[in-house]
Structure formats: structure tokens, C-alpha cells
Regions:
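Acidic, surface-exposed loops and disordered segments
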Residues: 1-207
Length: 207
């Protein structure tokens, strides 16, 4: 009975068939905007710090996203402050280490890893990265990690580390470059700008 209450009230006030105006949202980025801004960043401003509140806000998206069989088995470690330097030692070599992210989220699984956990992992990482972009931050998703060293660093034997979301404020510009040739999609840097080749829609749709 209450489902269409607002619609009925609208018609009572403005008349049946009156055009309904969509609410105007100021300052809310569209999905396309977030996707375009959500680029892999490898060089970060070292004086721009990520707050604990920002990290919690990023992880909070996982309370709203899909999970295979609704198992919700992923767990998250928020890394900032004194724990950043030792984790950097594990994740990066010089010279990349000194310009790397200033905060991290380590993603774990609380149950044995399987293909559905890996699907959940992809959904989670992309969702958190877009939330970070919404907050004015940038990310690098790092899946090539030494799981044993990370386990030992945080003395956590109960959970298996799967990937790390590296977070900070970009110190480089990254742009998408539409291409037609799929033979070489290697990103490159030119005149201080990092370009990422991307195939066009017609190149990825199967007709």
C-alpha cells in the first residue's frame, strides 16, 4: 500500500501525468568518471597522507558488494603509520619503493582459496579502488606478493594474504589512449605522462 504513496502524492499536488524531475546531485561523480580516473598509479606524493578514516571508508564498500554464495570470506588489514615502511620493503624494490604508496589495504581470505574467492577478490579490489578515487586518492592493485613474508610481518597465520591495494595521492599523470591494434598494449611514458592503450568497444564486442 505504501509502495506508491509518494507517486500518488505527487499526482495529487501536481496533477496526473505531470513530468517528474530527477533530483539534481551536485558534486557526485558518475560511474564513467570514476572508471576513467581509476588508473594504476605507481608514483605517489610522499607528503600526502591517507587517514585512518579514509581507509575505513574504502573498506566499508565491502559491506555492500556482491559475494559468491554470499560467503563474505575476505578480510582486510588497514596499514598506515609505522607498518608502512616494512610492508614497502616486501612489496617493492628501489627505486620504486621510495615513491610508492603511503597506505595499504592487505586483502586476505579466511577460508581456503578457490575460484569464487578469486572472483570476490576482483570485485572487492575494483570497488575499493573506485571508492578511493571518489575520495580524491589513487591506487595500485598488487597481486604479485610474497604471501609468506606478509604473513610473518603481521604474525597472522589464520588468514591467507591474496593481494594488496596500495593507496596514496598520485605524483604522475595517467591517460587512456584508444588503439585499434591489439598486438602491443604495453603502457608507456612520454614527456612525463603515462599512457595506457585501451581497445575500443567495437574491438572487444563479438559480433
Amino acid at each position: 500500500m505504501a509502495d506508491n504513496y509518494l507517486e500518488k502524492r505527487y499526482e495529487e499536488v501536481f496533477g496526473a501525468g505531470a513530468a517528474k524531475k530527477s533530483p539534481v546531485r551536485h558534486g557526485t561523480p558518475s560511474l564513467n568518471t570514476l572508471l576513467v580516473k581509476n588508473r594504476t598509479v605507481r608514483h605517489y606524493k610522499q607528503d600526502a597522507h591517507v587517514t585512518a578514516e579514509q581507509l575505513r571508508s574504502i573498506v566499508e564498500v565491502n559491506t555492500r558488494i556482491a559475494s559468491a554464495m554470499n560467503r563474505q570470506a575476505l578480510r582486510y588489514r588497514l596499514v598506515s603509520g609505522d607498518d608502512v615502511a616494512p610492508l614497502r620493503e616486501i612489496l617493492f624494490r628501489e627505486p620504486a619503493r621510495s615513491g610508492s604508496a603511503t597506505a595499504f589495504i592487505v586483502v586476505y581470505t579466511a577460508i581456503p582459496e578457490d575460484r569464487y574467492i578469486d572472483i570476490d577478490l576482483g570485485i572487492s579490489l575494483q570497488s575499493m579502488a573506485m571508492k578511493a578515487v571518489e575520495l580524491g586518492l589513487n591506487c595500485l592493485i598488487k597481486g604479485n606478493i610474497d604471501r609468506e613474508l606478509i604473513r610473518n610481518l603481521f604474525k597472522d597465520e589464520a588468514n591467507e594474504p591474496l593481494a594488496v591495494l596500495c593507496i596514496g595521492k598520485a605524483a604522475e599523470s595517467v591517460f587512456l589512449k584508444p588503439v585499434e591494434d591489439s598486438s602491443d598494449l604495453t603502457p608507456y611514458t612520454k614527456d612525463g605522462v603515462h599512457y595506457v592503450p585501451k581497445l575500443r568497444l567495437d574491438d572487444i564486442v563479438i559480433f
